[in-house]
Design a protein with these regions (language model features):
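A cross-kingdom feature that marks ATP-driven nucleic-acid transaction machinery
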Residues: 2-15, 19-27, 142, 147-264
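Interdomain hinge/linker elements that couple catalytic modules in large macromolecular machines
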Residues: 18-178
Length: 264
């Protein structure tokens, strides 16, 4: 799992600080993709033998992604906003050739997406909201993806073309949702954002459309949900799994969502 898991309450502070380190000691020995899908019971038993992952995972989703949380916990979200603004106002013009006069529109675009994610893309609507041409909106989305502020998903990466609109958009990590969204946070969005964020390292992630939420490496289907999530949406689909929050152990093809954070 990227960055540092860290709790919001004093009693969890030490445990959360060593959350990732404990897991890595275990997973360096036993974890690879084939173990995750074929022997998840053994991995979960080892992890749960060291700590209770669920409360730590809940903290991680809100606060644990960036290590500067350790430096200033009270102003963590404010710092995240400042970093995002720096990337848009300074780095995008310098590194991507974005016109500095248009950074206000890019920030507006990010703000719209933060309120709407996961966003099934209507480029014409987005373009109208920020007052730019369709192709300019696509360029801005690509820039925000390269800047690790967004994750852009396509239904078919093999045939994707230049300037093709993404099929679904997520903020880059779940902490950004809590920091930037103006509406109440939907936990299902947080779960999906976490899954995309973690699975994209070392794997291709495609939007599943009618076959689950995500297709991984062109073959494995993941549907994301809570502990009571059923297989209705992925019934009879080969190599399909549910990634469920609020469970410590796997049940058949229903796997703990938190375990995805250690696949790379």
């Amino acid at each position: 799992m990227r960055a540092i898991g860290h709790g919001t309450h004093g009693k969890h502070r030490l445990t959360c600080a060593v959350y990732r380190q404990h897991f890595l000691l275990i997973l360096l020995v036993v974890l690879a993709e084939k173990y995750y899908l074929c022997q998840p019971e053994n991995i979960c038993a080892k992890v749960n033998g060291f700590c209770k992952p669920l409360p730590l995972f809940k903290d991680y989703l809100q606060y644990g992604y960036y290590p500067y949380y350790m430096e200033n916990q009270r102003d963590y979200y404010t710092t995240m906003e400042q970093v995002s603004n720096f990337v848009i106002e300074t780095e995008l013009p310098q590194l991507c050739g974005v016109d500095a006069g248009n950074t206000r529109k890019i920030k507006a675009l990010l703000g719209i997406l933060a309120t709407s994610v996961p966003f099934e893309v209507d480029i014409s609507k987005l373009s109208a909201l920020i007052g730019v041409h369709r192709n300019t909106t696509l360029e801005y989305l690509a820039d925000l993806g390269r800047a690790d502020l967004l994750n852009l998903l396509y239904a078919d990466l093999v045939s994707v073309k230049k300037m093709q609109k993404p099929d679904k958009i997520y903020l880059e990590n779940p902490n950004m949702i809590y920091a930037l969204a103006s509406n109440p946070v939907k936990i299902g969005t947080v779960w999906e954002t976490f899954a995309v964020n973690q699975l994209k390292y070392g794997h291709t992630v495609e939007y599943g459309k009618q076959t689950g939420d995500f297709r991984i490496d062109g073959k494995i289907i993941f549907e994301v949900g809570g502990a009571d999530k059923t297989f209705k949406q992925i019934a009879n689909i080969p190599d399909s799994y549910i990634l469920a929050d609020d469970i410590e152990y796997p049940y058949g093809h229903k796997l703990p969502l938190w375990l995805v954070g250690f696949m790379y």
